[in-house]
From Swiss-Prot:
Cellular location(s): Cell membrane
InterPro entries according to UniProt: P2CMN_synthase_LarB, PurE_dom
UniProt lineage: Bacteria, Bacillati, Bacillota, Bacilli, Lactobacillales
Species of the source: Lactiplantibacillus plantarum (strain ATCC BAA-793 / NCIMB 8826 / WCFS1) (Lactobacillus plantarum)
Protein function: Involved in the biosynthesis of a nickel-pincer cofactor ((SCS)Ni(II) pincer complex). Carboxylates the pyridinium ring of nicotinic acid adenine dinucleotide (NaAD) and cleaves the phosphoanhydride bond to release AMP and generate pyridinium-3,5-biscarboxylic acid mononucleotide (P2CMN). LarB can hydrolyze NaAD directly or it first forms an adduct with NaAD that releases AMP and reacts with bicarbonate/CO2 to generate P2CMN. Is required for the activation of the lactate racemase LarA. May also be involved in the activation of other nickel-pincer cofactor-dependent enzymes.
Keyword Transmembrane helix set for record: yes
Keywords in alphabetical order: Cell membrane, Magnesium, Membrane, Transferase, Transmembrane, Transmembrane helix
Ranges that cross the membrane: 172-192, 206-228
Source taxon at top rank: Bacteria
Name by which UniProt lists this protein: Pyridinium-3,5-biscarboxylic acid mononucleotide synthase
Catalyzed reactions: deamido-NAD(+) + hydrogencarbonate = pyridinium-3,5-dicarboxylate mononucleotide + AMP + 2 H(+)
Topology within the bilayer: Multi-pass membrane protein
Cofactor requirements of the protein: Mg(2+)
Length: 246
């Protein structure tokens, strides 16, 4: 597929009419695969390419989407991908890397950080790490340096204070917590940077699969906290990446 510059050069040389050029440019924005209409123009519009949501898609469908995207951009990120599904598609994508804790797949080399600033990913407990790793892998794939600060929840708050220099040095802080979700408010009261809070479904009984943590974060008294959906490490990292690269 010709690039935009190549198409414009053909028009300038009289080898292609403006109408034909416009048609080629429009056609190059998507890839119709029958089961998916892949957005090839998203990176130009939004700054980051389309990310594949692996849940609910077959291995064959994911391979097709990756192959379409790879014509335009690398690296390519797939989220919510089980180990079993990765094993099924790996023969077709031998260079793919599986991040087991995050349940993410990347194709293509991770880019160097685009800015000197970094994103801190902070968790309350070890059980929150799958969501944290989804956030960290997403942020790294989008060209950000990530500092991981794990297992520093309020049950042993001295652990948090020992890492405050790292957290305060970040341009954006992602705080991930289940149970009652108090860590986001604590961090929000200690830093002068944007805090993106991610409630997780870690907990039982009246944690209500993360609803309690979500409501705690939404009702935080600490200013400067933004809250995303339960277990949405990807969404937090996407927003944090936009802030870090402004």
């Amino acid at each position: 597929m010709a690039t935009t510059a190549e198409i414009l050069q053909q028009v300038a040389a009289g080898q292609l009419s403006p109408t034909a050029a416009a048609q080629q440019l429009e056609a190059g924005k998507t890839a119709a695969l029958g089961f998916a209409n892949v957005d090839l123009d998203r990176q130009r519009r939004n700054g980051f390419p389309e990310v594949i949501y692996g849940a609910g898609k077959t291995a064959t469908q994911i391979v097709g989407i990756v192959q379409a995207l790879s014509q335009q951009t690398l690296p390519i990120l797939t989220t919510r991908l089980s180990a079993e599904k990765f094993a099924a598609l790996q023969p077709a994508l031998p260079t793919a890397v599986y991040h087991a804790t995050a349940q993410c797949m990347t194709v293509g080399e991770q880019p160097a950080p685009k800015t000197p600033g970094y994103i801190a990913v902070v968790t309350a407990g070890t059980s929150d790490q799958p969501v944290a790793e989804e956030a960290a892998v997403t942020a790294e794939t989008f060209g950000n340096r990530v500092e991981r600060v794990y297992d520093v929840g309020v049950a042993g708050i001295h652990r948090l204070f020992a890492k405050l220099d790292v957290i305060r040095g970040a341009r954006v802080v992602i705080v991930i917590a289940g149970m009652e979700g108090a860590l986001a408010s604590v961090v929000g009261g200690l830093v002068d940077k944007p805090v993106i809070a991610v409630p997780t479904s870690v907990g039982y009984g009246t944690s209500f699969q993360g609803m309690t943590a979500l409501l705690t974060m939404l009702n935080s008294c600490a200013s400067g906290i933004t809250v995303v959906n339960i277990d949405n490490g990807f969404g937090a990292a996407y927003s944090a990446s936009m802030v870090n690269q402004m």
